[in-house]
Amino acid sequence: MSAFTPASEVLLRHSDDFEQSRILFAGDMQDDLPGRFECAASRAHTQQYHHWQLLSRQMEDRVRFSLVAEQSDVADCDTLIYYWPKNKPEAQFQLMNLLSMMPVGCDIFVVGENRSGVRSAESMLAEYATLNKIDSARRCGLYHGRLDKQPTFDAEKYWGEYQLDGLTIKTLPGVFSRDGLDVGSQLLLSTFTPHTKGKVLDVGCGAGVLSAVLASHSPKVRLTLSDVSAPAVEASRATLAANGLEGDVFASNVFSEVTGRFDIIISNPPFHDGMETSLEAAQTLIRGAVRHLGSGGELRIVANAFLPYPKLLDEIFGFHEVLAQTGRFKVYRTVMTRQAKK
């Protein structure tokens, strides 16, 4: 990958300033700049499995994927470069976690797109560091300050939950639909009938709400859940545990870590990567589903009605049907037959 994001391009304008720095990169790292940046030493921590996949090719064991960063991730770093995400609670969780371990006096750089709200980093960190804007370009802001005081951090305080049809849904910052069931997932769930059976794969599981609701009225299903997000993986595990449900939950970039075949694959695939519209994950889902569905197995997804999934479903599977729709969303179903492109 050679193309850098606007945020990385702004950082590169200051590359000479980092030659002697020992840098910890974190946040929404959507390119491989952390692995190519010229500095004295570099490490990275990410909550996104696909970012870990990209960075580990160059950084190897100097990049780690997990929900919470540990002291070993910070090691002897004297500089934090943080890529601001689109989700403010996610930024709060990550920055408090990282800065609770970074040494007082360390340099803090926060970079991100203006429309993602990067400016709020100033107020968020005001108690711990005074940030000043030092550059503005490519519709991004770059802020710098030094750590005056370490915050305290307790990951347990960031957990949230909501109730849905007698189920407890556990959530964390950065998890999709953290505050309640989204309308797309609600529409998808409305298409399932009780007593569904077989092996179910929930791709992009978020807080595990689809699987939990499905298993609550179809106890014979065998659940497998995956997501690229560490908070989502942990939230899904907690959701299943809170409701006495069992399932295999793990991190995967769509099908990258998935093995075997399933009777049903369900998903409410994301179409935003950061602040940009991205169809890549859903296209990978549809194209890859043929390798993970048994004969007669079905793919059932919900998507914004304007997205061009019908054409792709027809191209790969030979047909599709619309099970439910509103003005904004459609639930698509297709089945693994001999005519599917394997």
Swiss-Prot record:
In its keyword annotation, does this UniProt entry include Nuclease?
no
* Alphabetically ordered keywords of this record: Cytoplasm, Methyltransferase, rRNA processing, S-adenosyl-L-methionine, Transferase
Using the UniProt record, name the top-level EC class of this enzyme in a single word. Answer: transferase
Q: What is its EC number?
A: 2.1.1.172
Q: What is its main location?
A: cytoplasm
Q: Which InterPro entries match?
A: DNA_methylase_N6_adenine_CS (IPR002052), Mtase_sm_N (IPR013675), rRNA_ssu_MeTfrase_C (IPR023543), RsmC/RlmG (IPR046977), SAM-dependent_MTases_sf (IPR029063), Small_mtfrase_dom (IPR007848)
GO terms of molecular function: 16S rRNA (guanine(1207)-N(2))-methyltransferase activity; nucleic acid binding
One Gene Ontology cellular component annotation held by this UniProt entry:
cytoplasm
Show the catalytic activity: guanosine(1207) in 16S rRNA + S-adenosyl-L-methionine = N(2)-methylguanosine(1207) in 16S rRNA + S-adenosyl-L-homocysteine + H(+)
Question: What CDD domains is this protein classified in?
Answer: AdoMet_MTases
Subcellular location field = Cytoplasm
Give a single Pfam family match.
Answer: MTS
What is the protein's known function? Answer: Specifically methylates the guanine in position 1207 of 16S rRNA in the 30S particle.
Family to which this protein belongs:
Belongs to the methyltransferase superfamily. RsmC family.
Q: Quaternary state and partners of this protein? A: Monomer.
State the protein's name. Ribosomal RNA small subunit methyltransferase C
Q: Which organism is it from?
A: Enterobacter sp. (strain 638)
